[in-house]
């Protein structure tokens, strides 16, 4: 359980702001290293730094709420939060529902297997006849279902622990973004390996409700994102947490 002092810090970021500052309610899972995670009772990561930096520029405060990833979209739709900072990939279905900021992470979908199996499963084409895990509510399930051989893949959805079940051999592979996959392999003791190159480019951004209030907030934060991109702040946050700059398209 989070310590009370730390919990208070999570719920209201202490910034010296004018009395007219708005509170931006930000939803995240708190379990997607290195973007949003809890360590020593403190919520931290790429997304936390990003939202704090945006709020500092716009003169707002940030109120973080953690919940299961699969519940984030519903929380945004119902008005319980104002946006989601959890590597939300822009997809046609999501664009039909929400207004998105400009992308701030460019990445790719990655197959990950138990260490030693990367010679047998060499990428997405090797997933025929395999059981593959994805996080419930993520866009990676849809990417797999759009493959021409999707009916040959047993797709299994998880709230969490896809890495552990892959390492234990309960599933043959999992699919996640390449950046997070590489960080999990680097930081955790689990015997995992990347299997082949990314098989789909993804662009991640902040979603907002497509109403007057949501659009106004999107435009305000988008302007701050442009400033952070221009002055190197986005790059610095990326290099701090990932060791490389993923805030611009590859190439």
Per-segment meaning from a language model:
Residues 61, 139-155, 189, 194-195, ...:
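Ligand-binding clefts/hinges and TM-proximal coupling segments of bilobed small-molecule sensing domains
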Residues 22-88, 96, 155, 220, ...:
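Extracytoplasmic small-molecule ligand-binding "clamshell" domains
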Residues 60, 89, 102-154:
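A conserved helix-loop-strand patch within extracytoplasmic ligand-binding domains
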Residues 6-18:
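Bacterial N-terminal signal peptides
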Residues 48-57, 116-118, 125, 130-131, ...:
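Extended ligand-binding regions for polar small-molecule ligands
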Residues 64-74, 119, 154-168, 179, ...:
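Short helix-initiation/N-cap motifs at beta->coil->alpha
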Residues 71-74, 86-96, 143-147, 168, ...:
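A ligand-binding cleft/hinge motif common to bilobed small-molecule-binding domains
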Residues 29-30, 106-113, 186-222, 244-251:
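Periplasmic-binding protein-like
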């Amino acid at each position: 359980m989070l310590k009370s002092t730390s919990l208070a810090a999570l719920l209201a970021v202490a910034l010296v702001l004018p009395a007219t500052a708005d509170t931006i309610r930000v939803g995240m899972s708190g379990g997607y290293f290195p973007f949003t995670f809890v360590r020593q009772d403190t919520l931290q990561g790429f997304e936390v730094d990003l939202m704090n930096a945006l709020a500092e520029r716009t003169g707002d405060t940030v109120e973080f709420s953690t919940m299961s990833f699969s519940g984030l979209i519903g929380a945004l739709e119902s008005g319980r939060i104002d946006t989601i900072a959890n590597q939300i990939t822009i997809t046609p279905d999501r664009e039909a529902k929400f207004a998105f900021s400009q992308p701030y992470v460019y990445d790719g979908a990655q197959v990950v297997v138990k260490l030693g199996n990367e010679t047998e499963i060499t990428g997405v084409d090797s997933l025929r006849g395999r059981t593959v895990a994805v996080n419930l509510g993520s866009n990676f399930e849809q990417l797999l279902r759009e493959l021409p051989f999707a009916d040959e893949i047993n797709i299994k959805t998880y709230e969490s622990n896809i890495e552990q079940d892959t390492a234990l051999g309960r599933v043959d592979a999992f699919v996640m973004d390449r950046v997070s996959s590489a960080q999990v392999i680097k930081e955790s003791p689990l015997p995992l390996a990347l299997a082949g190159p990314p098989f789909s480019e993804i662009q991640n951004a902040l979603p907002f409700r497509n109403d007057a209030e949501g659009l106004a907030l999107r435009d305000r934060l988008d302007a701050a994102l442009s400033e952070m991109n221009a002055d190197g702040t986005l790059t610095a946050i990326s290099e701090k947490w990932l060791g490389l700059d993923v805030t611009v398209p590859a190439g």
